[in-house]
C-alpha cells in the first residue's frame, strides 16, 4: 500500500511522529531505534512504512532502515505476537543483536524485552531461527571469542549458506579462547573442507 514516505518531519514525540508529504500529514508509530536517528522537526526525512488494517483501525508504522521494517514484519509472523511487541523488540535491541539472540537461543535476554515472557521467547527462537541470518545487517565481524563472538561467527556462517544448527556447531567447535571472530570463521570453514 504505502511502502515509503518522503517529506518534512512535522512532529515527533515517542512513539508518534507526523510527516508532511505535499501538505498531507501522515501520522506514524515508530520504534525508539527510529527516534534516536530522526532529524530535527522541520527537516526532510525518508521512512520505510508498514501499513496495517484491522477491523476497527488503520495504522501506519515508520522505520529509517529497511532491515528494521523487515524484522518488524517477520516478528509478527510468530504465533501470538503483534505490532506492539514487534515495536518493543526494535526499541529494545538492534536488528543485529536480535539476530544474535535468536541464533544463540538466548531466552533470558529475549525476556528482558518488555512484553516478552519465557514461552513467547521460546516460540520466537523456534519460529525465527531459520530466518535470523536475514535480519543481520552484515556489520563487520570483529571481537574476541565469547558468547557474542560465537553468535557473530554463527550468523556469518549462516549467511554463507549453512543451516542454523550446523553453523552454531561449527562456530563452537572452531573457536579457541582469544580467537577473533574472523579467525573462528576461517577455522570453521577449513574444518568443513576436511
Swiss-Prot record:
UniProt keyword annotations, A-Z: Cytoplasm, DNA damage, DNA recombination, DNA repair, DNA-binding
Free-text comment on this protein's domains from its UniProt entry: Has three domains with a flexible linker between the domains II and III and assumes an 'L' shape. Domain III is highly mobile and contacts RuvB.
UniProt function note: The RuvA-RuvB-RuvC complex processes Holliday junction (HJ) DNA during genetic recombination and DNA repair, while the RuvA-RuvB complex plays an important role in the rescue of blocked DNA replication forks via replication fork reversal (RFR). RuvA specifically binds to HJ cruciform DNA, conferring on it an open structure. The RuvB hexamer acts as an ATP-dependent pump, pulling dsDNA into and through the RuvAB complex. HJ branch migration allows RuvC to scan DNA until it finds its consensus sequence, where it cleaves and resolves the cruciform DNA.
Region Domain I, annotated ranges: 1-64
Name of encoding gene: ruvA
Pfam families according to UniProt: HHH_5 (PF14520), RuvA_C (PF07499), RuvA_N (PF01330)
Region (Domain II): 65-140
Official protein name in the record: Holliday junction branch migration complex subunit RuvA
Subunit: Homotetramer. Forms an RuvA(8)-RuvB(12)-Holliday junction (HJ) complex. HJ DNA is sandwiched between 2 RuvA tetramers; dsDNA enters through RuvA and exits via RuvB. An RuvB hexamer assembles on each DNA strand where it exits the tetramer. Each RuvB hexamer is contacted by two RuvA subunits (via domain III) on 2 adjacent RuvB subunits; this complex drives branch migration. In the full resolvosome a probable DNA-RuvA(4)-RuvB(12)-RuvC(2) complex forms which resolves the HJ.
Localization per Swiss-Prot or TrEMBL: Cytoplasm
Keyword DNA-binding carried by entry: yes
